[in-house]
């Protein structure tokens, strides 16, 4: 089967949990041919892959959002029929447009995005929306907000569409929209896998963002919900990593009958025999994390600073690359400003080898799905302290029916004292750490094996092939 994986902002450009998962996933399915349709932010990253692509990746199609800002060329006068005008009106007003009509306008008719945005039709629609929703907002603010919202979408709708039997999106958002476009153009089924709930993550970012005009924050949030609604509607199956995520998808409008839970899985044998660190009088804490705002490394630094004031013989090892250069510099500056001792930025390391130096691990993310770093830590019998996000409580405390026991502590996000208290409790007893680590290892061995995950996805592809009369393995 020829499967188009649609990815946004991750593989193969950056390291991280989703990228690691994706690389291993492709390698483990040599029976399928994969096409990567990848969305990046900056065209300067074209071809700059940090992974050596597996041999069963047949093609890579790269699309960069900042290319939309450089659109030029002679604009043509465009006319739209009543059906097209209605679809465009609903797009601008964020009210359930007919996406197949929009795909036809920008794919088959090849209408240039700027031709629409500079057309009388757009200005008429835009005026009506502003009068209805933003009568007291400056015209310039409304126009630039609308343009910056629509231009990337219209640009993506005109993208070259790779041919595939199935379009498998690894998020909603822009990636989900491209998967729907591929489905429409080539009459192929769509699958969706969400590691986190993309729309909720964008909502959190927009609420905190300084670049969004306050009166338009609600519109930006509605925009991302609009994108998710289409792939939830069109997808044959929608997978999530844990039960609460599935519930969120259903609450956001996805048909419950198409929603499946397929947990992450790790290569357990790589971690299960890593020896525990000898008791040397120090407690070593590890954080396998990229330096990125969503990982909230600053709160981790503050919490460790407070812990070190209470317990001098503790060390923190932050293991990961820099995802955001500005944020990375701010993290290093914070360490210097506070005068934090015994904190080591290791950069990217071989986690299996480095795990021998650690007593337990910590994760302070603002948002997560089902973090591989926590699964790997538990597989290596290292308990964890995490924020109460995503699947972390289930991983450490167990889901319904899981009686293995507590394998770590959770704290609310961005609560440095709570994290410091949890780390102090973990530091207090080596015997408790060992017991928790063994519980966590048994949980991973039972529920989170790589082989189980792959079997579930193979079954999903097989079900899709049967339902849509597609080529199947061995045919």
Describe the function of each predicted region.
Residues 275-306, 317:
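Conserved donor-binding/catalytic core segment of Leloir-type glycosyltransferases
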Residues 244, 265:
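Carbohydrate-associated surface elements
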Residues 383-386, 390-397:
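Short hydrophobic beta-strand element within catalytic cores of glycosyltransferases
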Residues 366:
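Aromatic "clamp/platform" in nucleotide-sugar-dependent glycosyltransferases that forms part
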